[in-house]
Amino acid sequence: HTPSAEMNLEGNVRIGTHYMDKHFTPDAFDFKGKYNTADYYLSITPFSWVELAYTCTLQKMHRRDNQGNIISDEGRYYYQDRYFSIKIRPLKEGKWWPAIAVGANDPLGTLGDKGTSHDNMTPTNGDGKSEYFCNYYIAATKHFAFKVGELGVHAAYRNWKRDYNSKWNGVVGGITYSPSFARNLRTIAEYTGNEVNIGADCLLWKHLLIQASLQECRYFSGGI
């Protein structure tokens, strides 16, 4: 949930999906109240210093026709919120200094300032609160090797575009730990600016990454 300066290996391509508890998503991501959802994504690292991703998050709301008229009052996952992400690492981690990265999620936003349509038109998604995940950040990461494992320290300054995400603005960060007896396992603790989350991920057979987390140390989200 919080950014870091870590990058995937050059040439890596990742596809995955996650279940997300409603406490994980922005407060404005709602339909008659907040709801659990899921996303799926594609991530590529064409060079060691840049990472690109495309994410789709299932969105529950009224079904509408091409003119924006409601044709079904029942709320289902008829729509998806889509956005691009980019991370650039101008400084690689060294022995005495951290890696530094800058990045953004949904930097292009929408065509209009009222939703997912042109200005002065009715938003096609009907809520006028899009750009749910739009944020910008600068992050630093440093790893420390010990006999018992590797400790990662991550810090970032992040700014969200929408006011309803302001609780996550400012300084955020976390720590990661990989034990020496299981280098493919990593435990995580982070502060998002508003809550503390814990989690873990595990790489199996060099290709399958399993991830799990507890938002506010209580609410489960996870995926591959």
Question: Which residues fall in each region the model found?
Answer:
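Beta-strand-turn-beta hairpins that frame and shape the catalytic cleft
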Residues: G149-L151, L204
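Charged, glycine-enriched surface loops/patches
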Residues: L108, E216-R218
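Glycine-rich phosphate-binding "P-loop"
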Residues: G152-G173, F181
